[in-house]
UniProtKB/Swiss-Prot annotation, chain A:
EC code: 1.1.99.-
Gene Ontology molecular function terms on file: (S)-2-hydroxy-acid oxidase activity; 2 iron, 2 sulfur cluster binding; metal ion binding
Enzyme class at the top of the EC tree: oxidoreductase
Organism: Caloramator mitchellensis
Keyword Metal-binding recorded: yes
Function: Catalyzes the dehydrogenation of glycerol 3-phosphate to dihydroxyacetone phosphate. Is probably involved in anaerobic glycerol metabolism. Active in vitro with the artificial electron acceptor 2,6-dichlorophenolindophenol (DCPIP), but not with NAD or NADP. Also displays a very low oxidase activity in vitro on glycerol 3-phosphate with O2 as the electron acceptor, but this activity is most likely not physiological.
Signal peptide region: none
Protein name in the entry: Glycerol 3-phosphate dehydrogenase
């Protein structure tokens, strides 16, 4: 019997799990995918927003600015790549300058520190690659960039380290109300729990509707991106937004925390919650809009494109509350942007709700806030490199040549407490296959290492989601 | 560690360059290869057709490589496999990593770069759609099938009619897969004519010119691709879409010289070849650093790689012995009409022995034409051609005496229709 069962191991579920692991509670984290952070959390702009976008008084307004300021300490504790590069919202005419004023006011009310409205000259001095056609910009010094999946994986690892039970590849198919609380039924197992926290992202409606008559509907809103090679990662120094307008709501141009350049997203409401495909219309649109922000856009350096789905609801705000007709069942739904930025504050908010319901929950004495990252071999000093190779020869062997990732790093990614099982899970943990050749060279070796370490056949290794098999069998199996 | 010559990359280019340098008197040579064995991309090319020019016979890739590996051993040239070069710099220091030595610095008098090339990916050409498993570059599929012994799919569509794509169409068919179509964006193939005949025609595999893949279906594994015809601007034409049900998409959409090491060292790169600017000795913009093979420009025949590498080996030997002449007449090569690039980009007349082979690619198919070679505007030679295509590298052999001149000047080559 669990005290709390969290459904969904995106950044929100993992944040809450880690926060709950500070208490003497028996916690289950249940996820339908074969890895954490493998849906919306892996396909977004990776921006830690400053917090001036949301209307004051909304949950978004309350939680974004607060969450933002928690990232320095969190990322230090969890050894997650995070950079406060600052963000700029560009204005191209007088109307947009007025919009900047409004955003500035909102930011102040939401408690965002260090906001400035800058002249064109100042902006171009800060970043000469920005378009000459601007009038000015809103500068938010606290805006940052992060590795969203590293963050989520780190939260999950630290939560498990502190006693949370994680159940991957478990899709919740039904929930029954019981005297003790709830019985959660998945395609694999059943889990009894006193309280449920619903963090199922795009499917939070489905989970809510299993227990509540207060029906919810999540509308998927797609956003598409281009990712460019590291050679052009320093095209801009800041996160560059445009004013929300009819042309583009938030198409941005930004460096990523790994040194690539990211362009996107657009916004398109859909019906299909699995429509994670890109379209030529969407991709052309973001390029057209992004061209306004910068002097040149080296699109010939694109290495991939991808899409993410925001979980939008009619309420147009985060929904974080106990369901009225289901005691002890807490919805954390409609967590669209800035969900990533707000995640740390959301988890505190949820703990407060739980404390209200459960009355007494005690802090653990031996909570360990630290999680060690996998060493990034290429970034070590000469001496450290040699020491590591002496200790473990697998660090002397480069597997991914674009990103210079060693076999030692890959093996370590597989054997962590929330270890990699797929080629893409390895990629999200150590970046093997993330470079300009997109795994062309290293994927055969990564498959080989996964198969060896997991003790399975090469043909059993999948690319990403269940069913994404890579090899169809040994050669000469089709012809007799 | 100190060497006279460090060769980066143990493919046919690196092998031939190291051998030639030894034959020209260089003592302390080390060749460094990141893979398990020497031979480079040839190890996975188990089809034949290698060595027609150099040996006058048809060898497979591994057979061709073996001849050079044997010679390397006979000449007692040192080499390291499973060793990655992580960095080189303009002081000719080479930083390597392997399991036994760890992270080490090597000081060299000269360096030859022969890192080969990599394949362009789906991302580079921006195909929209889902991102399922089952999308491979042709070279990756080749490695899986020919070296690892695994099949990558059962029903396959191939995008791009370069040599690797063509060869893989045949290879997959022989392994029991069904190749539904080869789709080519341009109105011509970038592969060798003999490969179109031997790999597609012989197996009744259709080839569609001026077509491309515009969508990929399948959330976990490829379930199909949509193909459309393109107009003159390579934009898909609405209404021409055809859906092919398949589990695999193979991409053979071009190779890019692998120049991250070169770029970080500050070597100047020619935007047309994506490889370093080189002179008649295959020396880059940094004195004493040479380059050859696919790292300079993408070759379709290994024989030309070998010739070019031998030139680099001789050049490095001359440089190490202090015999290279760096003053005197310089001739720059310039693309005339119809020429996409010429390698080398610069000739120092005094360093030429008796003749020089210029490698080049044309920008379109031309039938019954001439290649006119002009020195400072005056035609000095003219070569008749029945057909030239961007898929087949052209070579032009010039004698040192053809180039007699007393001033720095430019040499241009252009395609003239007869
Ligand atoms: C295009 C785009 C751009 C964005 N940009 C930013 C940004 O720059 N900054 C920012 O702060 N935010 C941004 N966001 C928002 C941010 O990505 C999300 O708020 C955040 O990732 C949501 O996390 P989550 O955990 O709620 O959802 P998810 O990551 O989707 O996690 C939900 C999990 O629940 C699981 N699940 C679902 N159903 C079941 C079931 N039946 N049983 C078990 N498990 C189940 C899913 O598999 C999934 O892993 C962006 C979003 C998008 C789409
Ligand atoms: C699939 C395919 C089919 C072909 N078919 C034919 C054919 O039928 N007939 C024909 O004549 N030609 C053919 N060719 C062309 C010919 O094989 C190539 O042009 C030739 O192999 C290129 O030689 P290279 O030495 O420049 O590069 P490669 O063979 O690619 O060798 C480069 C080597 O450098 C190593 N390297 C790179 N970076 C580093 C580093 N940092 N540290 C250490 N080592 C490094 C690589 O591991 C590799 O071994 C084919 C080519 C391909 C790719």
């Amino acid at each position: 019997m669990f005290d709390v069962a969290i459904i969904g191991a995106g950044v929100i579920g993992c944040s809450i799990a880690r926060e709950l692991s500070k208490y003497n509670l028996n916690v289950a984290l249940i996820e339908k995918e074969n890895d954490v952070g493998n849906v919306t959390t892996k396909a977004n702009s990776a921006i830690i927003h400053a917090g001036y976008d949301a209307k004051p008084g909304t949950l978004k307004g309350k939680l974004n600015a607060k969450g933002n300021l928690m990232f320095d300490e969190l990322c230090r504790e969890l050894e997650v790549p995070f950079k406060r590069v600052g963000s700029l919202v560009l204005a191209f005419d007088d109307d947009e300058m007025k919009t900047l004023g409004k955003l500035y006011e909102q930011g102040i009310q939401n408690g965002v520190p260090e906001l400035y409205i800058l002249s064109k000259e100042k902006v171009l001095e800060m970043d000469p690659n920005i378009s000459d056609n601007i009038k000015g910009a809103l500068y938010a010094k606290t805006g940052g960039i992060i590795g969203p999946w590293e963050f989520t994986i780190a939260l999950a690892e630290n939560a498990v380290e502190n006693g949370v039970n994680i159940f991957l590849s478990n899709e919740v198919v039904d929930i029954e109300k019981k005297d003790f609380g709830y019985r959660i039924i998945t395609n694999k197992d059943t889990y009894d729990t006193k309280y449920v926290v619903n963090c199922a992202g795009l499917y939070a409606d489905k989970i809510n509707n299993m227990v509540s008559n207060n029906k919810m509907e999540i509308i998927p809103r797609r956003g598409q991106y281009y990712l460019l090679d590291k050679t052009v990662g320093n095209l801009v120094k800041y996160v560059i937004f445009q004013c929300p307008s009819k042309l583009g709501k938030g198409v941005l141009v930004t460096p990523t925390v790994h040194g690539n350049l990211l362009i996107g997203p657009d916004a398109e409401d859909l019906i299909d919650k699995t429509a994670l495909n890109t379209t030529s219309e969407g991709l052309n649109f973001i390029v057209e809009v992004a061209r306004r922000s910068v002097k040149t856009l080296p699109l010939n350096m694109a290495i991939t494109n991808f899409a993410g789905l925001r979980a939008r609801t009619e309420r147009d705000d985060f929904i974080i509350e106990e369901a009225v007709d289901a005691k002890g069942f807490i919805n954390v739904a409609g967590i669209e942007s800035p969900g990533l930025s707000s995640a740390p504050a959301i988890s505190l908010y949820v703990i407060d709700i739980l404390k209200n319901i459960a009355k007494k929950i005690e802090k653990k004495e031996n909570f360990n806030p630290y999680r060690r990252a996998i060493p990034k071999f290429i970034e070590l000093s000469e001496d450290e490199k040699n020491e590591l190779v002496k200790k473990d020869k697998r660090f002397g062997k480069i597997i991914c040549r674009c990103e210079s990732i060693t076999e030692g790093e890959i093996v370590s990614a597989i054997h962590r407490n929330v270890g990699a099982r797929t080629v893409d899970a390895v990629k999200r943990r150590v970046r093997a296959g993330m470079g300009r050749c997109q795994g062309g060279f290293c994927s055969p070796r990564v498959i080989e290492i996964l198969a060896r370490e997991l003790g399975v056949e090469m043909t059993e290794i999948e690319k990403d989601h269940e069913g994404s098999y890579i090899l169809t069998g040994p050669t000469k199996s089709e012809v007799q | 560690m100190k060497y006279d010559l460090v060769v980066v990359g143990g493919g046919p280019a690196g092998l031939a360059a190291a051998i030639e340098a030894r034959k020209n008197g260089v003592e302390r040579i080390v060749l460094i290869e990141r893979d398990r064995e020497l031979g480079g991309i040839l190890q996975q090319c188990i089809h034949n057709g290698f060595g027609l020019h150099v040996f006058g016979e048809q060898l497979t890739g591994p057979e061709y490589a073996e001849r050079f590996i044997n010679e390397l051993n006979n000449l007692k040239i040192e080499y390291l496999t499973n060793t990655m070069v992580l960095e080189i710099n303009d002081k000719k220091e080479v930083y390597i990593l392997n399991q036994e030595l760890g992270f080490r610095r090597i000081e060299a008098k000269a360096i030859i770069l022969s890192m080969g090339c990599r394949e362009r990916t789906r991302g580079a050409i921006g195909i929209p759609g889902f991102r399922p498993a089952g999308i491979f570059t042709a070279g990756t599929a080749q490695r899986f099938i020919n070296i690892e012994g695994y099949m990558v799919g059962k029903k396959v569509v191939i995008l791009g009619s370069g040599d690797i794509g063509l060869i893989m169409a045949r290879r997959l068919t022989l392994e029991g897969a069904k190749v539904l179509a080869v789709v080519e964006l341009m109105p011509y193939s970038t592969g060798l004519t003999r490969n179109i005949v031997q790999c597609l025609h012989d197996y009744n595999i259709p080839l569609f010119f001026e077509h491309t893949v515009i969508d990929i279906k399948g959330k976990n594994r490829v379930e199909g691709v949509t193909i459309a015809k393109v107009d003159n601007n390579r934009v898909p034409i609405r209404g021409t879409e055809v859906f092919y049900e398949c589990d695999t998409l193979l991409l053979s959409v071009g190779l890019i010289p692998e120049n991250e090491l070169s770029r970080n060292a500050g070597i100047e790169i020619d935007a047309r070849t994506s490889g370093p600017f080189v002179n008649e000795s295959m020396e880059t913009s940094i004195e004493g650093i040479f380059a050859c093979g696919n790292v300079v420009h993408v070759h379709d025949l290994v024989d030309f790689v070998t010739q070019e590498a031998q030139r680099a080996g001789r050049g490095a030997a001359r440089y190490i012995k202090g015999e290279a002449i760096d003053n005197g007449v310089v001739i720059r090569t310039v693309n005339g009409n119809g020429i996409r690039y010429i390698v080398p980009q610069k000739l120092r007349l005094e360093n030429l022995n008796d003749e020089i082979n210029l490698f080049m690619r044309v920008d379109n198919i031309y039938n019954n034409c001439r290649l006119d070679v002009k020195l400072d505007g005056k035609i000095i030679k003219s070569f008749k051609k029945r057909k030239v295509t961007p898929g087949e590298m052209e070579t032009v052999k010039l004698k040192k005496s053809d180039l007699s001149t007393y001033n720095d000047c430019s040499l241009s080559i252009e395609v003239v229709k007869e």
